[in-house]
Amino acid sequence: MSDETRDAAPGRRDGYRVWALPGLPEVQSGDDLAKLIAAAEPALADGDVLLVTSKIVSKAEGRVVEAADREAAIDAETVRVVARRGPLRIVENRQGLVMAAAGVDASNTPAGTVLLLPEDPDASARGIREGLRDTLGVDVGVIVTDTFGRPWRAGLTDVAIGAAGVRVLDDLRGGTDAYGNPLGATVVATADELAAAGDLVKGKAAGLPVAVLRGLPQVVAEDDGEGARAMVRGARDDMFRLGTSEAVRQAVTQRRTVRAFTDEPVDPGAVRRAVAAAVTAPAPHHTTPWRFVLLESGESRTRLLDAMRDAWIADLRRDGKSEESVAKRVRRGDVLRNAPYLVVPCLVMDGSHTYGDVRRDAAEREMFVVATGAGVQNLLVALAGERLGSAWVSSTMFCRDVVREVLGLPDGWDPMGAVAVGHPAEEPKARPERDAEAFIEVR
């Protein structure tokens, strides 16, 4: 591409042409796609963009595999399941793409076989670009396309899964719009727009797997560029990394006991949302046996923990523990002291029944204790959903009178431990899966 063309390109708004290439033969393993494309369109020019359907790239690269069981092929290409609806799976595949069936396709391929996506679509695009440069002496952009569904939208469209020589993203952040308003979040997915334009002329069943787009030389780069991988947003940065049902299931199991926190303040609103989840727990007799005391000030936390420490030391000394042993045990309370936020859950027996015998009265209290535990578990799970770490510690149960006195609580409020809350100092470790069968008896 000449310097004159490159200099003029950014200001061009004259429109563009896009057309499909007829006459391409059925692609076989080992075929040179660049030579096939050059033969079909020898008049390619600098600044053109080639839009190449991934199916023919896969065929040329020998990505057609025998697979009587398509589901097994999908399993092999899957890194994680994002969502599942009946037989349909939306997954992240080994290329980092989130798509239906990991890109495994049983169409346009002989019976008993499936097409896998190219192993490295960016490398595939680079190879085609280099081949066209060698064959025709032209400097073009190449995009490998595949068909995707889209969140919140019906229907399918083509997007870029591989690219070479194309400015795949147009980052407008830091600029202004026509009214002078700052652009703070606008990054245009140029390669996807080009892929969709090509799909208009290629179609889905017309046997036209390659399109040429001409008239937008500003999107073609001198070097190969970052490729389409630069467009893939990682799961950690994705606000919707799981489907609804999958997110609900994961939320229940992602709670961890977190004992070390950063100094980042805890959003009181997040804790209140967790409390709102806590009080949806089951409870006997249509009661609401939960109360949650939120210690939001450092002064209230220190006052409570100092009083609890003194009560604990007194208990340990009565047990005959040495001063060294006492000091060692008391240090275990640091998880509460180092937390930037504490919640003290309490049990109230309002609405409980009195039966007049020890057995049934004990069972009645146990029902309320179980309900309180369910509320605390809801709290912990909801805090995890707010990306907050937590640790339930039993210590307030051993000095309830002290806790009630320091916090000014009614006599009928029974503290049921304390929950340390904060932003985890490090990513919680993955928990090994437990086999449910080890905890089940069937009758």
Curated annotation (Swiss-Prot):
It catalyses: oxidized coenzyme F420-0 + GTP + L-glutamate = oxidized coenzyme F420-1 + GDP + phosphate + H(+); oxidized coenzyme F420-0 + FMN + H(+) = dehydro coenzyme F420-0 + FMNH2; oxidized coenzyme F420-1 + GTP + L-glutamate = oxidized coenzyme F420-2 + GDP + phosphate + H(+). A divalent metal cation 2 binds at T147. GTP binds at L24, P25, E26, V27, S54, K59, N108. InterPro entries: F420-0_g-glutamyl_ligase, F420-0_gamma-glut_ligase-dom, F420_FbiB_C, FbiB, Nitroreductase, Nitroreductase-like. Bifunctional enzyme that catalyzes the GTP-dependent successive addition of two or more gamma-linked L-glutamates to the L-lactyl phosphodiester of 7,8-didemethyl-8-hydroxy-5-deazariboflavin (F420-0) to form polyglutamated F420 derivatives, and the FMNH2-dependent reduction of dehydro-F420-0 to form F420-0. The gene is fbiB. In the N-terminal section; belongs to the CofE family. This is Bifunctional F420 biosynthesis protein FbiB. GO terms for molecular function: coenzyme F420-0:L-glutamate ligase activity; coenzyme F420-1:gamma-L-glutamate ligase activity; GTP binding; metal ion binding; oxidoreductase activity, acting on the CH-CH group of donors, with a flavin as acceptor. Binds 2 divalent metal cations per subunit. The ions could be magnesium and/or manganese. Monovalent cation. The ion could be potassium. FMN binds at A283, S394, R431. Keywords: GTP-binding, Ligase, Magnesium, Manganese, Metal-binding, Multifunctional enzyme, Nucleotide-binding, Oxidoreductase, Potassium. Coenzyme F420-(gamma-Glu)n binds at D315. GO terms for biological process: F420-0 metabolic process. Its cofactor is Mg(2+); Mn(2+); K(+). A divalent metal cation 1 binds at D105, D146.
